[in-house]
């Protein structure tokens, strides 16, 4: 199974039925599979904090959900986490595709990548980086179970080691021979 198939199956196993997301190249296979699966309701969001708010509201109405976004979009959700999800003990699942590491060309992505984990730590939000297929299902499954058991949010970060990263970003890297034409 691919990483996206494993994530989708693990969400299903844990009765997570809502996927609120902001479109992202890396997450595309996962988002397309969720949209094509009748077990899921997918909701596109204009901003990442909107996706988190959608998941929080759905949980209060009895529906389990996950907010999916890219690292740079994570920078927008601080207020939603600090003023809604954390104080009201909402088990919001965040699935974040990681950019800003391993040869990233975009300085904005690198800055956000360096602040993401410290921000999660400051908010007391458990987070795990998923880096290989061998441990993906176990870590994601236990993270989701812990979130719903403890009524606390969790973030799972999809490393480029797992997803292959963003091909568009890789194409922008400057080789030792100089910029690509």
Predicted features along the sequence, with ranges:
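Thiamine diphosphate
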Residues: 1-181
């Amino acid at each position: 199974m691919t990483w996206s198939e494993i994530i989708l199956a693990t969400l299903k196993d844990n009765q997570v039925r809502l996927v609120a997301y902001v479109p992202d190249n890396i997450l595309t296979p996962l988002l397309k599979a969720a949209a094509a699966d009748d077990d899921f309701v997918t909701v596109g969001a204009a901003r990442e904090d909107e996706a988190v708010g959608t998941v929080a509201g759905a949980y209060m109405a009895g529906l389990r959900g996950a907010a999916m976004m890219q690292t740079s979009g994570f920078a927008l959700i601080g207020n939603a986490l600090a003023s809604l999800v954390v104080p009201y003990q909402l088990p919001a699942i965040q699935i974040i595709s990681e950019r800003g590491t391993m040869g990233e060309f975009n300085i904005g992505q690198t800055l956000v990548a360096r602040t993401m984990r410290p921000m999660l730590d400051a908010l007391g939000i458990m987070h795990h980086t998923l880096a290989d297929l061998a441990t993906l299902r176990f870590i994601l499954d236990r993270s989701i179970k812990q979130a719903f058991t403890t009524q606390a949010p969790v973030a799972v970060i999809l490393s480029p080691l797992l997803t292959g990263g963003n091909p568009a970003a890789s194409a922008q890297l400057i080789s030792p021979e100089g910029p690509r034409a």
